[in-house]
């Protein structure tokens, strides 16, 4: 009977949660420097994810005492982790077809370049959403256009990011 089916369960949703959790498990960051809370969309060409900045994060103490603002390097790191690393891990785990891009224990992503423009401040406790669209993934190098939005859906930052997968 259709009325007895649990609203929160659907085989596709369970499958996607497993994929997202597998990718999150492969992120090479510990909790104090992991800036990915949730992946809401993922394909071979695009990723959408979010992060909520903790009010007591270590970088707020000295970044404008009394009037803390999220440093641009942290905004850039959030964009890179969601927009480049998550998408790169997904491409590798799902067979990118590129030689030399297998994901093992001694493999880690490196940001090789970023060109970011900032439009709005991000304050402690704010939630941000990152959307990344792939330009290409060749020979272990991923290049994407990455945008960050605040909870009001205002553009916070936008940039072009490139990164590679390196063997340790």
Predicted regions mapped to residue ranges:
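Active-site- and interface-proximal helix/loop "cap" or "latch" segments in soluble metabolic
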Residues: 70, 75-89
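N-terminal leader/capping segments at the start of a protein or of a new domain
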Residues: 1-41, 45-47
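Beta-strand-rich interaction surfaces with strong enrichment in secreted/lumenal proteins
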Residues: 24, 66-67, 117-120
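HotDog/MaoC-like acyl-thioester-processing domains
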Residues: 2-16, 119-168
């Amino acid at each position: 009977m259709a009325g007895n089916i649990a609203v929160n369960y659907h085989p596709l949703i369970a499958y996607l949660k497993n994929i997202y959790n597998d990718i999150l498990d492969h992120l090479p960051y510990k909790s104090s420097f992991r800036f990915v809370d949730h992946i809401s969309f993922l394909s071979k060409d695009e990723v959408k994810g979010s992060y909520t900045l903790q009010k007591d994060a270590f970088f707020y103490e000295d970044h404008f005492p009394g009037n803390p603002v999220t440093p641009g390097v942290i905004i850039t790191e959030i964009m890179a982790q969601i927009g480049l690393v998550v998408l790169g891990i997904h491409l590798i785990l799902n067979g990118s077809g590129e030689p030399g891009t297998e994901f093992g224990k001694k493999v880690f992503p490196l940001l090789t370049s970023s060109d970011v423009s900032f439009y709005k401040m991000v304050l402690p406790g704010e939630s941000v959403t990152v959307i990344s669209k792939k330009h290409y993934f060749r020979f272990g190098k991923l290049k994407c256009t990455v945008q960050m939005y605040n909870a009001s859906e205002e553009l916070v930052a936008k940039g072009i990011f490139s990164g590679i997968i390196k063997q340790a």
